[in-house]
Amino acid sequence: MTILVLGINHKTASVALREKVAFSDEKRLLALKQIKQTQLAESAVILSTCNRTEVYLHNKNVGPQNDEVWLDSCVQWFADIHQVDLEELKSCLYSQQNLQASRHLMRVASGLDSLILGEPQILGQVKQAYQMSEEYYSLHSDIGMMSTELSRLFQKTFATAKRVRTETHIGESAVSVAYAACSLARQIFDSLRNLNILLVGAGETIELVSRHLLRHGVNGLAIANRTLSRAEKLVEKLETTQKIDIFSLDRLSEGLKRADIVITSTGSPHVLISRNLIEQAQQMRHYKPMLIVDIAVPRDVEESAGEIESVYHYTVDDLHNIIQYNINQREQASQQAEHIIQQESADFFEWLKVHQFSNLIRNYRESAEIIRQDLLEKALQALQNGENTEQVLQELSHKLTKKLIHQPTQAMQTMVKAGNTEGLQAFSHAVKF
């Protein structure tokens, strides 16, 4: 085993467990440092989103005889760094290796393993995860650069995801978790046009939500974020003539008192909107219906918020039914995408196998070239000394054959003694006898 992925996602684990194993930027750096210091792997890439946490590792020194030991060590490390119970983690954890690992990454980056089938947002998240690891290894070159194998896998993955987008219809509709959140709002309220909508956060997900809402003619839009400058930049990116109010999180209670809909997605490690804060807002609003869609992991809204009168509280996990419709629409395109991924992952794995033994192949060829040059030099010298040309050529061909087949013959004898029938069959097929 040289390449391993292990992780959890929305299919295998609840939002509560996903919160526990999410990587903040600080913890990501700590993880990359630990992985290298403990020699768990040569290099790694950590993908942490609302719906999944995955660690991709490469260790060329792990062979078939100790791959299970390595896997166990990786799982134990994963549990330790997040301080979660090992058995609880194992019940939700999946792992893949080599060909299956490369295929899994390509499926993830192409949106085939997302909550919404084919959603494009994940590709950007995979690229960002790769870039963060690449930057880490560049800044810490004393511990080594990212391995060629892992780098090649991610570059191949990006090209594959682009091919899937180009050659299939899987990305024609703009669907994402953000789109699902907006769809939910349109299902609960007849019209969004005259409602006050509060967005908490200013990241990529909130940007997508904003664009969906503006396309549906929303007039009362406000954005709350920890830093006003980032919220201002988001409004600039939206390039809209619609007035959008922005304010910092210390005025969140004021925003809640005006909001009919709250959609939140921040990177906060703690709850931002408590039940008490919502209750105060609802009292001021005379308990008019309020929809809260919390698409952050860890969650931004206190879990018991849905118990408040006239409050409709949804998390990422609650969006499943809305998303299922989109999945059904994209099944046909996904089959074509799976075929592309099967081709590309097999192509990468063939490269990986050759690359692993590239030094062996190169050394064998260099050795053969040295033998050829040595024997040729002796033959030319013999001809210059006036020896019979046919005899010199016969001797040259005989010695060249004998020396070149010496190592392969020894290898065959070793395989015979070891009972390695698969190796012998592969060898006989290669030399066609």
UniProtKB/Swiss-Prot annotation:
Binding site for substrate: T49, C50, N51, R52, S114, E119, P120, Q121, Q125
Swiss-Prot/TrEMBL catalytic activity: (S)-4-amino-5-oxopentanoate + tRNA(Glu) + NADP(+) = L-glutamyl-tRNA(Glu) + NADPH + H(+)
UniProt GO BP: protoporphyrinogen IX biosynthetic process from glutamate
Site features described as Important for activity, chain residue numbers: H104
Family matches, as Pfam families: GlutR_dimer, GlutR_N, Shikimate_DH
Keywords attached to this entry: NADP, Oxidoreductase, Porphyrin biosynthesis
Keyword Nucleotide-binding attached: no
GO molecular function, one term: NADP binding
Recorded superkingdom: Bacteria
InterPro entries: 4pyrrol_synth_GluRdtase, 4pyrrol_synth_GluRdtase_dimer, 4pyrrol_synth_GluRdtase_N, GluRdtase_CS, GluRdtase_dimer_dom_sf, GluRdtase_N_sf, NAD(P)-bd_dom_sf, Shikm_DH/Glu-tRNA_Rdtase
PROSITE patterns, sorted: GLUTR
UniProt enzyme class: oxidoreductase
Binding site for NADP(+): G201, A202, G203, E204, T205, I206
Catalytic residues, chain numbering: C50 (nucleophile)
Complexes and interactors: Homodimer.
UniProt remark on domains: Possesses an unusual extended V-shaped dimeric structure with each monomer consisting of three distinct domains arranged along a curved 'spinal' alpha-helix. The N-terminal catalytic domain specifically recognizes the glutamate moiety of the substrate. The second domain is the NADPH-binding domain, and the third C-terminal domain is responsible for dimerization.
Similarity-based family: Belongs to the glutamyl-tRNA reductase family.
Note: During catalysis, the active site Cys acts as a nucleophile attacking the alpha-carbonyl group of tRNA-bound glutamate with the formation of a thioester intermediate between enzyme and glutamate, and the concomitant release of tRNA(Glu). The thioester intermediate is finally reduced by direct hydride transfer from NADPH, to form the product GSA.
Protein name: Glutamyl-tRNA reductase
Gene for this chain: hemA
